[in-house]
Design a protein with these regions (language model features):
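Core catalytic alpha/beta fold that binds nucleotide/phospho-ligands
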Residues: 1-238
């Protein structure tokens, strides 16, 4: 199942197209993936693990849907490959900013509609109490834990939102930070109305937050995160 929506959020000019693709069975994914450019199919075959290959295909299908929705007429005939750091990158000049993330069961792609947007970062994680507990133990400071408890006393969803916000900011700003938990600090997490323009499209949003992230002496970075459909999503831009 594919959902396509547009949203505005702090830090990114214009609208951002957001695509969520619930990963179908491998056979169906391979069938749909056959429509991708040869260069993308070659990259997919470089993954020996079927799960990694399926995630790659789902991500490329999602980002092409986003590019088409954003009005980029080259998206149907040109591949989205990789840059020197392994990040997804359209192979044509003047392409919009994009980002891709995935879990075992879904892929998410973000595409900017504004040429002035320099970069986007999207992340997604499934909601899992064991994952939240591990993050609290290994990657979240006592100060951050207090902030999270104010918006999520059970500390199940907010820790994952914090992690996704960090990941989204790392992608947006091209940070090389190693172990994120020791260098990126969330300084604010504020409940907010969701930024999706139409909540009737099947997102089933339960909560949303604006999150401020700090790294060394940089200006504060911002991400918008939300809980929907059993997962947490986060988006950042500049």
């Amino acid at each position: 199942m594919m959902r396509i929506e547009r949203m505005h959020f702090e830090g990114a000019p214009g609208e951002t197209v957001l695509v969520e693709l619930t990963t179908p069975e491998s056979a169906l994914l391979a069938r749909d993936g056959a429509r991708l450019h040869e260069g993308e199919r070659t990259l997919a075959q470089s993954f020996t693990a079927p799960a990694r290959r399926d995630a790659f295909l789902a991500g490329r299908l999602a980002v092409h849907a986003g590019l088409a929705n954003a009005g980029d007429s080259r998206a149907h005939r040109m591949p989205v490959l990789r840059d020197g750091r392994g990040r997804p990158q359209p192979s044509w000049a003047d392409a919009p900013a994009i980002s891709i993330a995935h879990t075992k069961i879904r892929a998410v792609a973000a595409v900017s509609t504004a040429r002035t947007c320099k970069a986007l970062g999207v992340d997604v994680e499934e909601i899992d109490a064991h994952r939240a507990e591990a993050l609290l133990r290994m990657a979240i400071s006592p100060e951050e834990r207090k902030l999270l408890a104010e918006v999520d006393p059970q500390l199940v969803v907010a820790p994952i939102a914090l992690w996704c916000a960090r990941e989204a900011c790392v992608k947006t700003h091209g940070l090389d930070v190693g172990w994120f938990g020791s260098v990126l600090q969330v300084s604010s997490i504020q409940p907010t109305p969701p930024r999706l323009t139409d909540a009737a499209t099947g997102w089933d949003i339960e909560a949303a937050w604006n999150i401020e992230v700090r790294f060394e002496s940089r200006a504060p970075m911002h991400a918008h995160a939300w809980q929907a459909n059993g997962a947490v999503f986060a988006l950042s831009g500049r």
